[in-house]
Amino acid sequence: MFAGNAPPRNAFGLSMARTWSAELELKGAGGEAVDLLRTITSHGVADLPPNDIDPDTVTLTTTLALPRGAATVRVSAGRRGFVRIEGAGRKAGVLEAVRHMLRLDADLSAFYAVATADPELTWAAAGAGRLLRSPTVFEDVVKTICTTNCAWSATVRMTTALVDHLGPQAPDGRRAFPTPAAMAEADETFYRDVVRAGYRGAYLRSLAEDVDEGRLDLEGLDDRELSDDEVAERLLALPGCGPYATAHMMMLLGRYSRLVLDSWTRPTYARLRGRKAADRTIERRFRGYRDYAGLAFWLYLTRDWVES
C-alpha cells in the first residue's frame, strides 16, 4: 500500500483504524512492585525484532502473532502503578500476551527478601528482576541460538531477516516473529543466503520442523512441575543448544538457580569487582540466593544499564 493511501497513524505509529487502549496493574503475583524500565531493558535479546525498545520514553513496541492475525501494540508507563497498552484492530489475546512478556505472573517476593539484606543488591527490591520474555518459548530458543558464537551484529542480522521475510504482517506493515511452520517451510538456501545463519541454519530449520510436526513441545518447557535438571537436559538435547544457550534459556524460563558464565559476564564481573575471579568464587558470592542465584548475578552485572 502506498503511503498516500495508508490509514492515518497516531503519535506512536499505530494505525488509527479501530484503536484501543487498556491498562494492566504493574504488580507481581505476590503483590510486589514492578519496574517497567528495568523489565523492558533487562537483557540484550529483549531488543531483537520484532521488539523495539525506547528506554528514554520507557516504551516497548512489538508485533504479536495472534490466532486471528498479527497485531502491533505499544506498551508504556501509564498512571502510577500501571502499564498502558495501546493497539489497533483486535484486542483479544493482547493483554494476556503482554502480561506474559512482562512476567506479571511471577512472584519475586522471596528473592527481594534476600536482596534487601545484600548492600550491593538492595536496589533490586524496588522492582527489578523480571527478564522480558517472548510470547513463546520457540521464539526465545531461536533467538538464543542466533546469539551463539557470533558478534551481536550477526545476531541482529539473523533475527531481522527471519522476521522481515517470514513473519506474519500486521495492518501497520510491521511483522511478528515467524511461526514454526513458516520457518520449517523455508529452504536451506534461505537460511544460507538470506539469513546467513551459517551452521545454525540447519539447526533452526530442524528445530522448526520438529515443533511444527509435533515431535517437539518447546512450550512444555515452561511447565513448573519440571525440575531444573529436567529442563536443562531437554534444552541440551536441542540442535544448536549447548551449555551457554541452555543457561541463557533457563533464565528466560524463569529458572535462576544457575549463573550464566560466559565471555561477557566473567569480564564484566571482574571489572565491577576490580579483579578477576574464578567461576567457583563468583558462584560462592551468590550462593545465598539459592534458586535465585543466577538472577542476583545478572542484576549485579546490569545495574548500570539504567541510571539511578
Each language-model region and where it sits:
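HhH-family (HhH-GPD) DNA N-glycosylase catalytic core used in base-excision repair
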Residues: 2-308
